[in-house]
Amino acid sequence: MSNSKFNVRLLTEIAFMAALAFIISLIPNTVYGWIIVEIACIPILLLSLRRGLTAGLVGGLIWGILSMITGHAYILSLSQAFLEYLVAPVSLGIAGLFRQKTAPLKLAPVLLGTFVAVLLKYFFHFIAGIIFWSQYAWKGWGAVAYSLAVNGISGILTAIAAFVILIIFVKKFPKLFIHSNY
């Protein structure tokens, strides 16, 4: 396969997964208040685990940009938007470091990559919560405790949802994770 066809296929895959993440993010996902289950992370995690670090980083960036330009972002300031809608979704690409290039597919790298990526994403949301969202803290809660509670619970719920979906994908569709040139 020629290099240009490979690049077109890769770019198409990145664009598709970023668009899918954006579309999924339009589905209401609130558990309580600001606590969410962000299943929209799953396409970017899958992209990262299938195509590697760079593809995942770019996919996350496109997803974040789509959220901002379509008005589906809670933006308080440029620095908050940068942290929560560019850095945080881009960080999901770190799962690409756990990419498996050959079969048989092992579950442990998929789960570890997912855990690390979701942890990193919600770390950035935690920092943003302390800096930008502290005025919304529950009565008697400090900024750190509030942000840790909201983002910690959201991160755990998101990781669990991603684990469940990706375990099903690994068991039923393992070829999704192994890229081939065909």
From Swiss-Prot:
Ranges that cross the membrane: 16-36, 56-76, 78-98, 112-132, 150-170
**Domain of life of the organism in this record?**
Bacteria
> What is the topology of this protein in the membrane according to its UniProt annotation?
Multi-pass membrane protein
**Gene3D superfamilies reported in the protein's UniProt record:** 1.10.1760.20
Kindly list the GO CC terms recorded for this protein: plasma membrane
Concerning InterPro entries, the annotation shows: Thia_Transptr_ThiT
Family assignment from sequence similarity = Belongs to the vitamin uptake transporter (VUT/ECF) (TC 2.A.88) family. Thiamine transporter subfamily.
Its protein name is Thiamine transporter ThiT
In its UniProt entry, the species of origin is given as Lactococcus lactis subsp. cremoris (strain MG1363)
